[in-house]
Structures are given as structure tokens and as C-alpha cells.
Amino acid sequence: MAIKILPPQLANQIAAGEVVERPASVVKELVENSLDAGANRIDIEIERGGVKLIRVRDNGCGINHQELALALARHATSKIATLDDLEAIISMGFRGEALASISSVSRLTLTSRTEEQHEAWQAYAEGRDMAVTVKPAAHPVGSTVEVLDLFYNTPARRKFLRTEKTEFGHIDEVVRRIALARLDVLINLHHNGKLVRQYRPAKDESQYERRLVSICGTAFMQRALSLSWQHDDLSIKGWVVDPMNTEASGDIQYCYVNGRMMRDRLINHAIRQAYQDLLRGEQQPAYVLYLGVDPHQVDVNVHPAKHEVRFHQARLVHDFIYQGVIAVLKQRGSGAELDIACCEPAPAWEPENRPSAGGNHFSRQSNATSVAASSPKEVLSSKGNMGGSRGGENRQYHGDHYQKRQGEVYQKLMQSEPEEKRELFPARTAPVMAEKATSAPVQVKNSNHSFGKVLSIYSPCYALIESPLGLGLLSLPVAERWLRQAQLAPTEQGLKSQPLLIPLKLSLSKEEAGALNRYSDLLGSFGIEASVSHGKATLCAVSLPLRQQNLPKLIPELLGYLAQQPSASAEQVVTWLARHIGSEYETWNVAQAVQLLADVERLCPQLVKSPPDGLLQLIDLQAVVASLTHE
């Protein structure tokens, strides 16, 4: 094949593979553009988890009419102009790829107006060459980006999106991080026409605390220790939670570098080392930290989603964070200021960072100031030192043991005896006619133990099947529930546990924790392994049918159900789980229905012979035939 330049749309779609991972990625890029435009109010409207619509409206500076078409072109940006600008990034965006990439996998419309213009203009790109069309529009000062039908032209990408609830949960988390980074900006988040989140701008100390409480919770603020420390061009501000307070949530782990959300290994390692000797059992550190670094001493152009950075003086930054955090943790009891010089040196850290470009910018001698308690207003007086990441994404675990156990399970599975192959869709032996449909159970006399052939999907969740007895509608959710019930039925050895890659923290009530201890053996037979320590429950493993479920919601609900039972049997747990486990699909296609029925026929052959109520209903075609023949 000859070498040739790719069409603009295809090139943009390739770039979108890195920039646009899911709807939350689009929201992040658009909101960051609004912040770079100087907006102090951002309205976000979402429909169907962002798949149908993402609309971000701001009151920023807007885009000039002459530059509007360039805004949708690749590598066109107002953020940088020279290599020196790239080596000292102070804006959120700088590559000029986001809008072009998003417009190549959606129907994007950009409407904007500057204060100098008397009318607004609207731009959109379409076609193979991504030609931009600009036309007049009505709009106040600022910009609105509307993204319709995300991944409509890349069905493979759209197929791997999760449910509407899951995708909106990712969007909600992104907005939460940005709201914590910029407390001075009003952010409204709507979903399906309803106001879900409203983060009001903070102007004084009480408003700072109120907004932080709305994001991090009251428990975090009540137990947080304020941190403020500066050394030359390095500064760290924020809050760390006293590890002696066992009720503090380890899920709150936000870290920001020069206003950018970060999940950096070096920063995470420094914080965990500071907490190392103070955590008990399965405790996790909780913190909100804002790190300020000279832009010339940090490279943000090392990760497609800008979630990681590289520090030119990595060792100095690591020790600076370590000493600042451990100092405020050690002074928590006495309330007196602690001299930084008395802290022990930080444990060894060997990051994979590039060498320093030029001389050591931080090599000048300076007396480090002591860690001083400060108010939220003082900590956040500079709105540039912000960005965030959740705790679950920062935690590091040694997974060799887990991988070994998973490998053993996989080998045993592969060594099992293969089943006798049989035809999924047997040849039809009777005409497509059926007796008049009744509410009585359908009796299917079929030696092949097959429901028949799936012809089509009716509505969102019914399969139209052709069986030897005629046509019928089969409820796929009911079939899925019976399949789960068969999969969850414990054997003499119990269901095989599969360790979670990252153990899951659960917040349980006293009744739920009591049920966990009381029914630990029963839960173990279903592959559910959990432990309680210091008032917190840790879920370590579940069986295969439960791995893809919403475990933080499912397990507490199961424990709540067990807490209400004077005694519980395995059959009760199986029935409860089968009814409460979420369906893998909201809408079905023929391939998914075929796979489901094949599994049901293999594990539940009795359902083929005698389908229960609500599973299968034959269709009476006699009336239809009579109407067509005018009889």
C-alpha cells in the first residue's frame, strides 16, 4: 500500500482516540477551555449520560469572528506560540487538538461572541475534509459548545460505553474535581433537564468552607489539618486528615499542580510515605493539596490526557511534599509549630524523570518556613494552585499475589472437559403456526433443549424467536435472571473467589457490619470475601458473576437484607442476588440475545421444557392469517 496523507477527518478521529475516551473526557476539555477564557460562570447540560448531548456555556472572553473557523482546526490554539511557551505552560489547554478531535466523532457546534462584536457567530465542521461553516447567530458574550451524538460515526467506540448512570457518574466526578480546583467559579450541572449540582462561587472564608463541605463532606472538614508551606518557587497548601480519626474517608484524595488535576506517581509516593507510620490496618490517607511549581520546572506535555507531569527537580519536589505533610501530621497533637529541620529524611525515591534542562533552578539556599495553620481563605487566595484526583485512582497495590491466583483459576477453567457440541438453531420441523396464546405455562417438547432461532429484537428487551411450535416473544431480562440464579447457585466447594485488583472500601452501618460477621461463611460460599477493621469494611474478592456489578451499592444492600433476616439460607441469597444484580445491557441486539439463550439452554435446560411465567409467550398467528385472507 502506498504512503499517503490521511484525510483530515480520519486524522482527527485517530487523535480523538487519545483525547476523547468517554463523555467525561469531552466535558473536561470543554470546561478547561472555558476556564482558560476567563469565565466565572459555567453551565453544563448533559442528556443520556453525555451520549446524546453535552452543552457547555460560559461567560468568558469569547472567540473573534475571524478566528472562529480556526478554533475547529487541528493544532490551532491561542495558548502558546513558541517553544518557550510550551516549556512554561500556565493554561489548562495548549495543544489545539480537543475541539477538532471532538468534532470528528460527534456533531459539534461552536457559538461565540466577544465584547467588541455586535453579533455572535456559529461554526461547525462536517464532511470528509472537515470544512468549517460559519454563520451569524444569537448569543451573549461568551461561548457555547454543543456536542450531539457522541461517537455516532465510530460505532466500535460507542459500543464500549457503559450505562447512562455510569457515564454520568464519571462526568459528575470530573466536574467535582474542577469545582474544587476553582472555588471562585460558579458551576451548574444539569442532567436530563434537572439541576444535579450547583457549586456557588466562594468569596470569603465561610463560603470557602461551605463549598468544600459540599464537595468533600462535613467529616473531612471537621478533621482536616491545614497545611501551608513555601520554599523558594515551591509551595504547598491545602488540608490533610488526621489519621487518628478512623472515620475520615480515604476516597478523598485530590492533588493539583499549578491548577491542573493530577494523578502523579511521585506526588502520591511522597504523601503515602509521610503517612506510612501513622496509618493503621487498611487506612488510606485523605487530603486536598495544591502544589505550586515554577512552570519552567515542570513538563505537562507528557500524557495524552495531561494526568501526569515530569518535574525537572523530581527529588527536591518529592522531599518538599514529604516534609510538608509529615510536619503538619506530627504537630497535630501539640498544636505547636514544628521545625522542618527536625523531620527525618524522606525514604528513597527513584522516579523515571528526565534530567534537568539546564542548571538547578531550586539550588539557591533558603530557610524553609515552618508549617503554619491557615484558614481556607488564605490557603486558596491564589486561584492558580489547583487540580485534583480521586483516591481510588492514586492507590498502588502489589498485585503479584492476585495475578497468580487469577492465573490458577484460568488454568483450571481451561483444563475443564469440553462440552458436546450441538446445533444452536435446529432445523424447523413444523410450520410457523401456534395455538392461541394463553396465560398458562408453555410446554415445549424439544429433545434438543433449544428455544429456537432468534429472528429479531422487539422493543428494548424482547427476542422474537422461531421454535418448532411457532413464533414467540421471550423476555431477555427474565432469562438473564434465571441464568444468574443458575450461575450463583453454590456448589459443595462454593463459588470460586476472584480477587479484586484494588480492594474496595465500604461504609457500613452497625447492622450491616453485624450481618457481615454473622453470615461470613454464607457469603464466602458465594465467593464474597470481606473483612472489618477499625469500623471500615474492605471487600477483597467476589465470584465471577459479581465482578462487573456496582459493588459499592450491591454489597451494602445485600448486607442490609441479611440483617433483617433472623436466619438466611443460600437459596434466599441466590434469589435476592438474581433479582438485584443489574443487567449488562439496557438495549439488546440479536448477537447478545443468541449468547444469552445459549447460556440458558446449557445451564438451565429445564426452562426449555417448561418455561416459567413471564419468560416465553407464544404468538397467535391464526387471527392475523384470518384477517389477511378475509375469513
Curated annotation (Swiss-Prot):
Among InterPro entries, the record links this protein to: DNA_mismatch_repair_CS, DNA_mismatch_repair_MutL, DNA_mismatch_S5_2-like, HATPase_C_sf, MutL/Mlh/PMS, MutL/Mlh/Pms-like, MutL_C, MutL_C_dimsub
Instruction: Show the stretches that span the lipid bilayer.
Output: none
Q: Can the keyword DNA damage be found in this entry's annotation?
A: yes
GO MF annotations for this entry? ATP binding; ATP hydrolysis activity; ATP-dependent DNA damage sensor activity; mismatched DNA binding
A GO cellular-component term linked to this record: mismatch repair complex
Query: Which residue intervals are annotated with compositional bias (Polar residues) in the record?
Result: 362-373
Q: Which CDD domains match?
A: HATPase_MutL-MLH-PMS-like (cd16926), MutL_Trans_MutL (cd03482)
Q: Which UniProt keywords apply?
A: DNA damage, DNA repair
BP GO annotations: mismatch repair
Region: Disordered; residue ranges are 353-398
An example of a Pfam family matching this protein is MutL_C
Q: Which NCBIfam families match?
A: mutl (TIGR00585), PRK00095.1-1 (NF000948)
Family statement:
Belongs to the DNA mismatch repair MutL/HexB family.
What does the UniProt function comment say about this protein? This protein is involved in the repair of mismatches in DNA. It is required for dam-dependent methyl-directed DNA mismatch repair. May act as a 'molecular matchmaker', a protein that promotes the formation of a stable complex between two or more DNA-binding proteins in an ATP-dependent manner without itself being part of a final effector complex.
Classification via PANTHER family:
DNA MISMATCH REPAIR PROTEIN MLH, PMS, MUTL, DNA MISMATCH REPAIR PROTEIN MLH1
Record protein name field = DNA mismatch repair protein MutL
